[in-house]
Amino acid sequence: MKFTPRPRPVTTWHLRVRALSLLLSALTTGGAARAQSVVAAPAPPSAPAQPEAAGEAKPATPENPVTPASPATAAQQRIEVTGGRADDTTQRQRSTAAKIVIGREEIDKFGDATLGEVLRRLPGVTTPGAPGRGGPPRLRGLGGGYTQILIDGQRTPPGFSVESLTPEQIERIEILRAPTAETGARAIAGTINIITREGFRRRLNDLRVGVGLENGTVSPGINWTHNDAKGPLTYNVSGSVFRGHRKDESTSQTRDEDVGSGATLREQIESAFTDNRRTGANLSGRLSWRLSEGGDVLTLMPTLFHTVADNRRTFSLVQPIGSTPPDYDSGSSHTDSAFTNGRLNLMWRQRLGGSRLELNGGVGAWRARGDTQRQEFTVAGGSTPVRTIVDGSRTRQESVNLNGKLSTLLGSPPATGPSTGPGNATVGEHNLVTGIELEALRRTETRSTLQNGTPLLTDFGDNLQASSTRLALYAQDEWALNPRWAVHAGLRWEGIATRGDAADGSARPENRSSVATPLLHAVWKPDPKGRDQVRLSLTRSYKSPDLGNLMARPSINSRYPVAGTNTPTAPDRAGNPDLRPEMALGVDLAVERYLAAGGVLSANLFSRRIRDLMRSVTTLETVSWSPVQRYVARTQNIGDALTQGIELEAKFRLDQMVTGAPRVEMRSNLSLFRSKVEGVPGPDNRLDSQAKATANIGADYRIRGTPLTLGGNVNWVPGYRTQLSDEQVTTTPGKRVWDAFALWTFSPTVGLRVLGSNLSPRDYTSTNTLELGGLREAAVNTSPSFTNWQVRLELKL
């Protein structure tokens, strides 16, 4: 950090602001400010403290501590914070494999309530669904297994959502656009590695109390982070408690047409209102013991997340056109659910001469339960339901993993003396990493479905089991050929065996697959002392089918009774044990220019050639759970595909580009995507759910002479049309999300932040059209979006 004092004239308005700041600071801290000195005042809540090395001695408390500066004096000091962002950019610049690093300062900037809200502003990241209702993050517009999400280098369990993590728990986020042997090759679109906060010797005790307001609902939350050290032990503990409340509404219009004549045979309109309440708690920690002065460290990492939800939905169905009356006119449903996820990881690092051994093992388990009752009524039947569906499910999964990694430095610097290449390696030295990963998991699902008291799906039993075992071996070498060139080469082999109950109730099938993935990354600097560099990556990656797609028990569409038929746009769902993994050959080419004070300009081109593409296909089948044929959606390998794109990013301070401009921090990125699925007619035969583009432009500025910081961001994703097959077409609407925040720093220990998300809400309308057997069915789904406000008080206790 660079602190440059600059006296300013003191006005009456300034004195009033400082008096208010002093009063609130005294009330919240008991009058005991913790400033170290007049010059080196602590950073405001928006700028996190920089961690100290674990082995660094903690400075002793002086007998006569320096008296804190008065607010009037402190306000006259000009504080310039450049270290945080420069550190993130330096990590990015020194990485041989292309990597974007987002640190604490950037994560904290907007004061988001969940990590998912932070991710959607990052370069190349999109989220499906309406604003504020999105699902898991996607890189390059590709989700559903194309984007690998890691937490501390470990894959997240099925059913886990990044929405369950708070920004206070995260130290940094790394986005790897191409896979590496160490992080894994199940990353065709890339990898998002979420690094949780580590323990360091500077004491922290932060409390953040906030409330969210949306569509007439209130959602409070509390987050607490504590960090300290005792002797050889450093630890960090983060906890949060939240209560979420959302109200949604939607309209679904379904129209059946005769393809030949164009006549409308049936039209139905369903309107629904949903009230969802969720309460949860999240606790995570990291405890590190330094076992010796040689760098031996033992780290324990427990995490626990628990949430309960209550969802109530009312709906009505009208049929303006149609000869056969609908099955119901109105109805309601109530779902009571809970999810608990716990994990315990143990990591041991030991120096072995010139090598470092790292052993990492963990056990984890998650439990989920859900109980739903749906009742349907007709006008003629009055208050007596014509159909009642009671569905209960209990799912549990246990997992265990053991990883070993050995890092070794080989070779020696040239005789002329050591020099550093473009990456982290010293010229002439090799950073060799070898590792092994073993993971085993077992899932058990118990489910019962009653329709008017009669059990459904009796052929499949109440209990379904599946297990999966994964073994991976890898080796990678990073070395600098000379001050201009650095190379990162790796080879990874991974095998997965899955066994479980089949979707059709037959004997337990087994699915085995293994993949060898060579990976090569290179970086070249035209001038060893310059700020420009060029990156090239040649990779092989893959996407494995998950347990749900392989072994899933049939899921009956609740809108259509099992005794009758359903429609192509409302199919039942089942698994396919014969799926093969998708394979992809990829190339990435990037040009980067690093600016002063942590700025960066970059352009990246990428291409992925995919073989054995997996896609959900809907067909009319004879099924065991119904006396008539029903439409069933199963995931199938349908052929090959190609996706390409360009990604642009610019991050800089405005006064460094325009003389005399204010010190505004600017951030912008633009990504353009194009894809083509072979065997599917064009022109919109793109990969499922891949948008044409995504863009962000944002800025933040601390108003000089005031404790006020303002910032904003605009996220844009255009609408697009997707030809899924010869018969099916979907359209996805565009999104334009405006966010803005204001931070008032009352004192170094107190801040008040206000965030507005989706300031210009728009309706979200998607369509799904399927044409089979001379009949065209089109479904139009519309749901409004809402502005969300967050108000949060940030305290450094």
Residue ranges and their predicted role:
Residues 99, 116-154:
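Extracytoplasmic beta-strand/coil segments of soluble accessory domains associated
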Residues 390, 399-405, 576, 580, ...:
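Outer membrane beta-barrel strand-and-loop segments of large Gram-negative receptors
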Residues 284-307, 334-502, 525, 529, ...:
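Face-selective signature of the C-terminal outer-membrane beta-barrel domain
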Residues 138, 154-180, 224:
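Short acidic/polar hinge/loop motifs at secondary-structure boundaries
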Residues 487, 602, 606-610, 628-720, ...:
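Gram-negative outer-membrane beta-barrel transporters
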Residues 4, 716-722, 743-797:
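C-terminal beta-signal and adjacent terminal beta-strands/loops
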Residues 115-118, 135-138, 175, 187-209, ...:
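N-terminal periplasmic accessory domains that precede
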Residues 77-110, 136-138, 144-147, 200:
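N-terminal periplasmic "start-of-domain" segments of outer-membrane beta-barrel proteins
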